[in-house]
Amino acid sequence: PTRRSSDLTRDLCEIHIGMPTQVFEETRGERGDVPKPERAGKLADVFNRYAGVSYASPGAVQLEKSLIRWMGDLVGYPAGAAGDLTSGGSIANLMGVVAARDAAELKGNQLESSPIYLTEQVHHCVDKAIRIAGLGECPRRIIPMDAGYRMDAEVLAATIQKDKSVGYKPWLIVASAGTTDTGSVDPLETIADIAAFHGIWFHVDAAYGGFFMLSDSARDVLNGIQHSDSVVIDPHKGLFLPYGSGAILVKDGASLHKAHYYDAHYMQDAKTN
């Protein structure tokens, strides 16, 4: 006999509640489990708005812009910053790497002499983003860490100087603000100074630690994040929201636009509305 959908929903909920996850035992999920996002998600499904352009859904686009502006203010970015809500840190890091790549105007024959600087503690999605962005031929300089699993800024500076002395053109530093393994935060202020001195794009993966900017006791640890060129931050981590909700923030909004904007004839009204 046909079962009612309410019966099926109840059965699925009972099965789910009774099955701990393989990653975090004795919990119903890895992240948030709160009712308000569930209700908001249902409303979004009911209205079913396309929020890719303002004229299609001005309210939804303005809501996203307001969220991006709030997060930009949180990390200390200026009014000209831009961003995008994503499905999580993987896509957000990819968008940041692509924005950095296009800002550096890298060409195929330049990749082998254009190093990227990071540590072994960087999230694996950054390596994936580098490959997907067509940057697999760029030398990856794995910078040693101190006893607290933080990037050694002195070694970073020396490595960059060495690369430049042989004609290489450093273009990207990836720092972590809350690593997955240890929660460590790289010395962002010092790294920002090094990046600015050499004219290198400074990207911070703050998917785990970024929202600790809301904490008076932890904010100082993240000092320097405001000097980065791009930041990844995940609401489904620091704000305990359900999957998937990530964000990419770019200080120079024009760089994000340049890297990800495309046009089409059928979208002509988007320019005038």
How would you name each of these model-derived features?
Residues P1-S5:
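Short, small-residue-biased leader/transition segments that mark boundaries at the very start
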